[in-house]
A protein has these predicted regions:
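Conserved P-loop NTPase motor module
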Residues: 1, 5-6, 138, 187-193, ...
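P-loop NTPase catalytic phosphate-binding loop
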Residues: 1-110, 119, 123-126, 133-202, ...
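Conserved C-terminal "switch" segment of AAA+ ATPases
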Residues: 212-225
Length: 269
């Protein structure tokens, strides 16, 4: 079933609306160095898909993107912020629960190949990994077992990337630069979005065999302008809006659906 209701998050060069529909896309990665519009673009993607059949959860070391969702969703434990106490351990617990839910959905498929019909009872679960590279760095520095903890998270995220899309458990990774150490399982990302980059190797890591003129254009993009590739299609250039953060918070409050069952209940073991 094709669900509708997602709102445009950008406008392309031809003046056409760019819409992200999580029930149709799969995993998403967005990258861009500081002050390129990546944060505003991420906000636009989120508010464009605050729908009853889309359930957000996630980890945000800087707390900006996911703080309003944590506050207004009615599911505070489904969002881990860097300002939370014991946030690293809570983040690992959340990812473990995401994999558990994914396994439950796979087990319930029966003879079906994938979930085709999403609803408020069975929503697409979008797992946001904001500042994923910073998250991995924090894991590695988390005590004597930091390296093992980082490896555990990479394994959990990799499992979601390889197995989650068919049952509506999707990863939305946000990076400054696409590098092999953080863009593991890169072939699993269907939608790839970039704002300005300062590293040509990162562009080649994100997009498959970009042309030299495309690379030159990406390294010189002005703030708010970006490019995307959807399932290997030709690059599509776009412009995203630039609302104030207060507008983002207000829009989340107005649009967010509060009836989803939390992935993590308080005191979840």
């Amino acid at each position: 079933m094709m669900l509708t209701g997602a709102r445009p998050w950008a406008v392309d060069e031809d003046g056409r609306s760019v819409v992200w529909e999580p029930t149709q896309v799969g995993h998403t990665v967005i990258s861009g160095i500081t002050r390129t519009g990546k944060s505003k673009g991420s906000q636009s993607l989120v508010v464009g898909t605050l729908l009853p059949w889309v359930q957000y959860v996630g980890i945000d070391p800087s707390a900006g993107l996911l703080k309003p969702l944590k506050f207004f969703s009615g599911r505070p434990d489904d969002f881990v912020l860097g300002s939370d106490s014991d946030w690293v351990d809570s983040a690992v617990t959340l990812l473990e629960r995401c994999v558990e839910v994914m396994r439950e959905r796979i087990a319930s498929l029966g003879w079906a190949e994938k979930i085709n019909d999403f609803s408020t009872e069975t929503p697409v679960i979008v797992v946001i990994l904001e500042e994923y590279a910073s998250f991995l760095t924090a894991l590695e520095g988390h005590g004597k077992d930091g390296k093992k903890l980082k490896a555990r998270v990479v394994s959990l995220v990799g499992t979601l990337l390889r197995e989650g899309a068919k049952v509506g458990v999707e990863v939305f990774t946000i990076l400054q630069r696409a590098e092999a150490s953080v863009l593991h399982d890169r072939s699993q990302y269907s939608l790839r979005i970039s704002y300005r980059q300062d590293n040509r190797d990162s562009i080649g890591m994100l997009f498959d065999q970009p042309e030299p003129e495309e690379i030159s254009r990406i390294v010189s993009l002005s703030p708010g302008r970006g490019v995307l590739s959807d399932n290997g299609q030709a690059l599509r250039w776009f412009q995203t809006p630039n609302p104030a953060y207060a507008d983002y918070v207000r829009t989340v409050e107005e649009r967010i659906y509060t009836g989803h069952t939390p992935l993590l209940e308080e005191n979840h073991e």
